[in-house]
Amino acid sequence: EFGGSAVRSLPVEARLTLCNLAVEFSAFSGIVAPDDTVFEYLAGRPYAPAGAQWEPALWHWRSLYSDADAVFDRELSVDCRQLAPMVTWGTSPQHGVAVDGAVPNPAMAIDADTRQAMERALSYMDLRPGQRMADIAIDAAFIGSCTNSRLSDLRSAAGVLAGRKVAPGVTAICVPVSSAVKRAAEAEGLDRVFREAGFEWRESGCSMCFYAGGESFGHRQRVISSTNRNFESRQGPQTRTHLAGPATVAASAVLGRIADPRRPPGA
């Protein structure tokens, strides 16, 4: 279960991303207690209770939270006040650092197995310890998947791309998470922002999140991607994937290397 002020401040779509990655904690599922943010999100949506059914549903949903005296196997507290946008350097979602940070040194690993895994990841990704993330050039940028291509994600990326162009030599692709999201984005004109910046605007689907339908990036290409996994060859044969949020992917596409979305190129 994810809770606390940082989680409560997140919109529903960001909470979905958080729960999507719960398996990386070796969990079968991830939950966030429903609150007014969730109820407002559900109101009026297709398949949501409506009319006389709404209040009983709301009453039931308000009961779905952990009791104040609940006992958990383990509780972890994370101070998110100084949390920066993150990006991965290796071949697992856990291989993450701040976008303005550097590739870690395997010599600092907590045990031999972790050190070997880090060394293998660095070899595959063709990176070296201490290398600044901001110095890593990319070949492609991908915004898509069930994790980070909902409407709020597309708005975030479009905010970075507006008035800017994708760097020469960078392949940039956007795949909305669903047909409904694609239609909503087009109604807002977001598709024009992506196209004018140099992104391909494609039909919804899994696409190159996991090499679907044989579609992939090129051999050994380095891709910054808003997807949820960065395993070896996940996006193509020997493709090297850096996971990041949509705004980071957009900023990186413009700069041609991993970029901090808090300081957009040309801003």
Curated annotation (Swiss-Prot):
GO terms for molecular function: 3-isopropylmalate dehydratase activity; 4 iron, 4 sulfur cluster binding; metal ion binding. Pathway: Amino-acid biosynthesis; L-leucine biosynthesis; L-leucine from 3-methyl-2-oxobutanoate: step 2/4. Binds 1 [4Fe-4S] cluster per subunit. The keyword Iron applies. Coiled coil: none annotated. It catalyses: (2R,3S)-3-isopropylmalate = (2S)-2-isopropylmalate. SUPFAM superfamilies: Aconitase iron-sulfur domain. Its EC number is 4.2.1.33. Signal peptide: none annotated. Keywords: 4Fe-4S, Amino-acid biosynthesis, Branched-chain amino acid biosynthesis, Iron, Iron-sulfur, Leucine biosynthesis, Lyase, Metal-binding. InterPro entries: Acnase/IPM_dHydase_lsu_aba_1/3, Acoase/IPM_deHydtase_lsu_aba, Aconitase_4Fe-4S_BS, Aconitase_4Fe-4S_dom, IPM_dehydratase_rel_enz. Its cofactor is [4Fe-4S] cluster. GO terms for biological process: L-leucine biosynthetic process. The keyword Ubl conjugation does not apply. [4Fe-4S] cluster binds at C146, C206, C209. It is an enzyme of class 4 (lyase). Belongs to the aconitase/IPM isomerase family. LeuC type 1 subfamily. Heterodimer of LeuC and LeuD. Catalyzes the isomerization between 2-isopropylmalate and 3-isopropylmalate, via the formation of 2-isopropylmaleate. This is 3-isopropylmalate dehydratase large subunit. It comes from Cupriavidus necator.
